Amino acid sequence: EIGSGLVGSEMCIRDRCCEVIYNPLTVLPKGRGKKEYRRILAVGRFSFGHKGFDILIKAFSVFVKTHPDWTLEIVGEGPEEALYRSLINEYELEKSIALHPFTKEVQEYYAHSSMYVLSSRWEGFGLVMIEAMAHGLPVIASDLPITRELLKDKDMAVLFETGNIAQLAGCMSYMADRTDWEWMGNKAVEYADTFHIEKVCDSWNNLLKKVVYGTR
């Protein structure tokens, strides 16, 4: 689960000799998110620093002051859960933020949310963003090499400076206040479809033909 830039730089491969095929979408959508839910979603392991959920909670504490009817749902498990719960208590957000354990039915969370936030400090790929877009959710993501590669110039996504709490809060307000949600949702679903497993398999077949028959 890594992007093309990481493959090329880590393995010292020239661009013309390298072809990256992204991981396929394995979580198939079961419904579609709506703005009316007023719910922000994040999914990932509660590991030390990685997913940046501490950043997200702090940013949400700023955002919710102007959007009090919105909630934040974080799905995951791991060693930082106690830290996140202490932050929720510190900001008195027990009624606005909920932590949920991992579930095989994560589609239910996607389908009943309004936007997705990837607050990671680093990321190899971030398939959860694609899963969210498959459910019609606009995405806010840390400005990382892979998110820039996947989301740059995409109308249903916005990037914020990694770790910048104020900027993330501003991005959440920007998304929450937009009026073109149906259009953004359509764009998100359309883009996520390019990661459908059949299309990824086609990419692999084409690449193998190039290698075997020398048609590169």
Locate each region found by the language model.
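Carbohydrate-associated surface elements
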Residues: 24
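Short hydrophobic beta-strand element within catalytic cores of glycosyltransferases
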Residues: 138-141
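A short, well-ordered alpha-helix in the C-terminal region of glycosyltransferases
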Residues: 167, 180-194, 206
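Conserved donor-binding/catalytic core segment of Leloir-type glycosyltransferases
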Residues: 33-51, 57-60
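A conserved nucleotide-sugar
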Residues: 53-98
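Aromatic "clamp/platform" in nucleotide-sugar-dependent glycosyltransferases that forms part
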Residues: 102, 121
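Single conserved hydrophobic/aromatic residue that forms the stacking wall/gate
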Residues: 1-13
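Conserved acidic donor-binding segment of nucleotide-sugar-dependent glycosyltransferases
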Residues: 153-154, 158-165, 174-179
